[in-house]
Regions:
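Right-handed parallel beta-helix/beta-solenoid
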Residues: 18-43
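Feature marks extracellular polysaccharide-active and adherence modules
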Residues: 61, 72, 81-83, 134, ...
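Structural detector of coil-to-beta-strand junctions
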Residues: 27, 68, 130, 159-161, ...
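Short, T/G/N/S-enriched strand-turn elements that build extracellular solenoid repeat scaffolds
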Residues: 39-50, 66-74, 80, 184-185
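Short glycine/acidic-rich loop motifs that flank beta-strands on beta-rich extracellular proteins
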Residues: 53, 65-70, 89, 149-155, ...
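Residue-level detector of conserved catalytic or cofactor/ligand-binding positions
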Residues: 186-194
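Right-handed parallel beta-helix/beta-spiral solenoid domain characteristic of secreted/periplasmic
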Residues: 30-37, 52, 57, 76-157
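Bacterial Sec-dependent N-terminal signal peptides
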Residues: 1-23, 100-106, 110-114
């Protein structure tokens, strides 16, 4: 009888622990140290089901996320929630500087190494921003969005940290850092005839 009672208690405890693990409000957790569901923000976004009609919450744990993040048009309602805006940082070193012409002002050509137009650059053919939001109903809080090029160089070509092309995008308690054109809003919605 004692073994039966112990078995029932053990099964009940396991069921409670399992229920608590499932009670997280987040559909995904990103942690650069590997303690979450994903190590990069883009991996978590890629896993979001297409055509969401309600918020898909992604917790991003404190850390430095050196990557470009693109939320595609077919992934609306993505919510990126960081732990602390000073410790949850999505950053990358890129700019949209054109090919060198030999007539650069003051001979400044260092930007070309990190230009999205340079075939030798690690960011060649990237979209021209650290984060590009195309999915509507985007929400984010407690995250810093940083274009390292703009912060480190304090001069040069356009170096976007955020490019929001989404309808109904909200930003709460976030930081945006770069040198030129840090945050770009470019919304084009064409209504179809009814």
């Amino acid at each position: 009888m004692k073994n039966i009672v112990l078995s029932i208690l053990l099964m009940s405890a396991c069921a409670m622990i399992y229920a608590q693990a499932d009670s997280s409000p987040y559909q995904a957790i990103v942690a650069v140290d590997g303690s979450g569901d994903y190590k990069t923000v883009q991996e978590a976004i890629n896993a979001v089901p297409d055509g969401q009609t309600k918020p898909w919450l992604i917790l991003i744990k404190n850390g430095l996320y050196n990557e470009q993040v693109i939320i595609p048009k077919n992934k609306p309602y993505v919510h990126l929630i960081g732990q602390d805006k000073d410790k949850t940082i999505i950053h990358l070193n890129l700019n949209v500087g054109s090919k060198l012409t030999g007539k650069e002002i003051g001979g400044k050509t260092a930007y070309w190494e990190h230009s999205v137009h340079n075939p030798s650059s690690p960011v060649y053919k990237y979209e021209g921003s650290v984060v590009v939001v195309k999915g509507d109903h985007f929400y984010t809080e407690n995250i810093s969005y940083v274009n390292d090029w703009g912060v480190l160089s304090d001069n040069g070509p356009q170096a976007l940290a955020m490019n929001s092309q989404a309808d109904c995008a909200s930003f709460y308690n976030c930081k945006f850092r770069s040198f030129q054109d840090t945050w770009m809003l470019s919304l084009i919605h064409i209504s179809e005839p009814t």
